[in-house]
Amino acid sequence: MFKLPPISLYIHIPWCIKKCGYCDFYSYVNKSFIPEKEYIDHLLKDLEKDLSLIKEREINSIFIGGGTPSLLKSSSIKKMMREIKKRINISNTAEITIEANPTTLEYKRFFNYKKSGINRFSIGVQTFNSDLLKKIERTYNKREAILAVEEIKKINKNFNLDIMYGLPNQSLKDVLLDLQYAVKYNPTHISWYQLTLEPNTPFYVKKLNLPNENNIFKMLVEGEKFLKQSGYKKYEISSYAKLNYECQHNLNYWNFGDYIGIGCSAHGKITQINGDIIRTIKNKNINDFMNGKYLKHKNFVLKKDKPFEYFMNIFRLYKPVLKRQFEERTNINQNYIKEKIKKAIEKGYLKNKIDFWDTTKKGKMFLNSLLKIFLD
């Protein structure tokens, strides 16, 4: 019998306080025209439509993302979590995360989130520098960011801080100061990533004064050194965690696990008992979604595409790639890719061991070139 991978649940909440110029996630600024109660009801109906694909499988993690899901009333989170638990099996040890904007953090409401089952919070600080916050169009200042982090510490030990580098006119000193502020509050996890300008975003067409490649490299080297000295282990390209506090939900993504995606524009990946992999994309048109048209697209992943999709995720992690896991997650014998593996080894991107493949420093540095081998 084919061994199914672990499975998670992603819930998309599409509204925001303000759409930032660099953001390419699907969201609406005006919350009022999407009734909160009705949207939660449709989320649950969307979930019900997917139940036939997962049968009785146990959910190992839940991630409530957006948008800004922390705009939800605590009563809405309570209802949503209660009703989800009626419909699916959730592990007693499941990690349940909600993303939050610092300006939405209210002690009582977030404490009630915790009472409803949320056991991990992810706070999108981005930077503690008020001038830089203005430049990236965030709606709060340094003082408000600090107050938010201080509040979340009172509510829950397990929390992540999102911090960015490579911001407009940002210096190395600015970068290290941000990280010093972050570790001061002892988060269990820090997501530290470079600002990237995605097509079809306002920042993409603006001529922003971003740090050059040499300065970005210095920021990365010095920042990683500081985080390591502060007790945070790098386990993924932009993820750093205290011991045993890696984000389980994201680890499942990167290990090519399964996940249901519910809500506007949510994506899903669900493996079937015969080894077939189904990809789902939910409707991003809010009016269609609120009229019950949840599923936009569903397709099977072709055999030839599975290796690329697997490696695109697993190579983000700083760990060896088990050959056994490749076969288990793709339902493909490793001999199917032996010529491509050979090419990657010849180019110095991979090392081949008896039970695993390991990316070299060169492979991590030129990850896109490594992945292209499996795309050709």
From Swiss-Prot:
SMART domains: Elp3 (SM00729). S-adenosyl-L-methionine 2 binds at residues 67-68, 126, 138, 162. It is found in: Cytoplasm. [4Fe-4S] cluster binds at residues 16, 20, 23. Pfam families: HemN_C, Radical_SAM. GO terms for biological process: porphyrin-containing compound biosynthetic process. Coiled coil: none annotated. Gene3D superfamilies: Aldolase class I. Residues 1-236 form the Radical SAM core domain. The keyword S-adenosyl-L-methionine applies. InterPro entries: Aldolase_TIM, Coproporphyrinogen-III_oxidase, Elp3/MiaA/NifB-like_rSAM, HemN_C, HemW-like, rSAM. GO terms for molecular function: 4 iron, 4 sulfur cluster binding; coproporphyrinogen oxidase activity; metal ion binding. Its cofactor is [4Fe-4S] cluster. S-adenosyl-L-methionine 1 binds at residues 10, 66, 99. Keywords: 4Fe-4S, Chaperone, Cytoplasm, Heme, Iron, Iron-sulfur, Metal-binding, S-adenosyl-L-methionine. One of its GO terms (cellular component) is cytoplasm. Its main location: cytoplasm. Might carry two S-adenosyl-L-methionine binding sites with only one binding to the iron-sulfur cluster. Belongs to the anaerobic coproporphyrinogen-III oxidase family. HemW subfamily. Probably acts as a heme chaperone, transferring heme to an unknown acceptor. Binds one molecule of heme per monomer, possibly covalently. Binds 1 [4Fe-4S] cluster. The cluster is coordinated with 3 cysteines and an exchangeable S-adenosyl-L-methionine. This is Heme chaperone HemW. It comes from Buchnera aphidicola subsp. Schizaphis graminum (strain Sg).
